[in-house]
Amino acid sequence: MKFPILIINFKAYYEASGRRAVHIAKAAERVAKELGVNIAVAPNHLELALVAQSVEIPVYAQGADVESPGAHTAHVAVDNIKEAGASGLILNHSEAPLRLNEIAKLTARAKAAGLDVVICAPDPRTSLAAAALSPHAVAVEPPELIGTGRAVSKYKPETVVETVQLVGRHFPDVAVITGAGIESGEDVEAALKLGTRGVLLASAAVKAKDPYLKILELAKPLAAGPP
């Protein structure tokens, strides 16, 4: 997993379903190539294989079930995600929370499969517990700010700083990224200045009238180098 990184979560937005998911992913890929920055996209499971076949940038799954491949109707195993072409996995988003033992199992399976692992956490202490599982990154996201347009880097900078310091002190090999309410390039720049190594966001890019222009704006701070 390369840093700094911008991860775009498509969630289950209509704007990112079907061929629209490919359109947004290609816009992200175009920006990544033009600016020379790291961008990953996380489409819905239904679009995962389609997007992975359509772009060269990293494609992450939004989550996975703890079941192994087999007779588990409606479940999605880590192996299924790998076979679909994903290169990474997001775990424990506040909209898809998991128990700690589930996160541990999924992290181990995903890493064994060669997938990047990003574990979401709501606060510094939970981020520390997540970092102890040795993911590639933890994403601190106060749930009350998600989707509000109130960027964590502006409205709760102390949460970001404490997480960066806490995880960095105990698990320096685990990167800290952040998200929740990120809407602009200015928000991304502020997050990087707080010591994070990237940003996880969704609606700002997915629901934009022109995804390419919006992703370009959001990614420019990554191209500027260390703050």
UniProtKB/Swiss-Prot annotation:
It catalyses: D-glyceraldehyde 3-phosphate = dihydroxyacetone phosphate. Its EC number is 5.3.1.1. CDD domains: TIM. It comes from the Archaea. GO terms for cellular component: cytosol. Its main location: cytoplasm. One of its GO terms (molecular function) is triose-phosphate isomerase activity. Substrate binds at N9, F10, K11, I146, G181, A202, S203. Pfam families: TIM. Keywords: Cytoplasm, Gluconeogenesis, Glycolysis, Isomerase. The keyword Signal does not apply. The keyword Zinc does not apply. It is found in: Cytoplasm. Pathway: Carbohydrate biosynthesis; gluconeogenesis; Carbohydrate degradation; glycolysis; D-glyceraldehyde 3-phosphate from glycerone phosphate: step 1/1. GO terms for biological process: gluconeogenesis; glyceraldehyde-3-phosphate biosynthetic process; glycerol catabolic process; glycolytic process. The active site is at H93 (electrophile), E141 (proton acceptor). Homotetramer; dimer of dimers. Involved in the gluconeogenesis. Catalyzes stereospecifically the conversion of dihydroxyacetone phosphate (DHAP) to D-glyceraldehyde-3-phosphate (G3P). Belongs to the triosephosphate isomerase family. This is Triosephosphate isomerase. It comes from Pyrobaculum aerophilum (strain ATCC 51768 / DSM 7523 / JCM 9630 / CIP 104966 / NBRC 100827 / IM2).
